Amino acid sequence: MTNIKFWLKGARLYTLPIGIVPVVMAISIFARYLFSGQILVKPYNIENFVIQSLLCIGVAAFMQISVNYANDYCDGLRGLDNQRSKRELSADGKALCDVSWRLADAGIKPKSVLYAVGISALISCIFGLIITIKSGVWLFIPLGLVCLVAAWFYAGGSHPYGYCGWGEFSAFLFFGPVAFLGTLCALFYASGFSKDSIALASVSQIAFCVLLSFIPGGFSACLMMINNLRDAESDIRHKKITAMALLGKRKGSVVFSCVVGFLVILQLSYVLLYVFYTRFIGVILSIGNPYKIVCTLNSGLLNKGVFIVSCILLLLITYVFIKKAHLLICAVSNSDYANAFPLCVKLAMLGALTFVLSIFACSLPH
């Protein structure tokens, strides 16, 4: 049991939400199309939707675990974590999820860690292959290979790109547009849609979904910024030149604040323009009429009351989202990285929660 505990600790499960958030957001967007009646799916294909969704979550989760093990292995070989146990704690004296801890500290050999990298990646690939077969999108195979190569060479190889300032961009790309849009394609095609029948065919809808993919990608990049700002001095000593190390803590904090501000604007735009404005106002104006919002969710009908409550919850969560975004910016500005890390994860999860609740709005703009 102790050995299992060490492996779970090395997997750094507290980072999993960052990998799963883009998948959950994409599932929510597809569900809005599905339950709004904008797209028609035969009843038996609902099962495909559920299975495909779980498979997509599995791919993201095990790929994230594989990346964590790979970073543990590669950074350990380069001695990057040797001095990190000496870094300052947060104001309340709490460490950040034992970030300085490595599997080697538990006596686990590097070769075993490398095996863990391979096993996690293999499980992710198996799930990905099933998704490919069910959806018929064979481009997922080369895309998956690119993801595997990118995951390894972030910290592995003789010239890891994560040591040359590309880590934040990589986190944004693979945990944003790639994961989000890839999940959307997997769900649409696995549900029996042809290229001509997909609701995302219009340029405006494609642009809409690409912009939405920036939200989870941005939070992934922010998480890496926090990590790299915290370790900037140590990284430079070990010749790991991250974007934050190049900018310095002051300029890096400013860039971080701008990115968080941009993500808040995107999140607000989604909630206010695409959920609240397009549907909520119409429902308020129709109170007193026999009109009901038709939705195939919850036994085929979602009445005005439930819809209004869901919108109110969305606004409350958005308020909390903005407050925590402010706290996150303040934490990074004050170099309180121990508290900034969990705040960033919570923000990403709140963002995903608003997407899930938006399913009750039943439709996307068109």
Regions found by a protein language model. Name each.
Residues 17-26, 169-184, 244-249, 340-355:
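Small-residue-rich segments of transmembrane alpha-helices in multi-pass membrane proteins
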Residues 23, 29, 41-70, 141-152, ...:
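Membrane-embedded alpha-helical segments that form the functional core of polytopic membrane enzymes
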Residues 62-92, 221-244:
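Acidic (Asp/Glu-rich) catalytic motifs at the cytosolic membrane interface
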Residues 68-72, 101, 149-162, 224, ...:
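C-terminal ends of transmembrane helices
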Residues 84-134, 240-277, 345-351:
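Multi-pass membrane catalytic core of lipid/isoprenoid biosynthesis enzymes
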Residues 99-194:
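Intramembrane alpha-helical segments
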Residues 170-232, 250-253:
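Functional transmembrane core segments of multi-pass inner-membrane proteins
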Residues 272-366:
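Extended hydrophobic alpha-helices typical of membrane-associated regions
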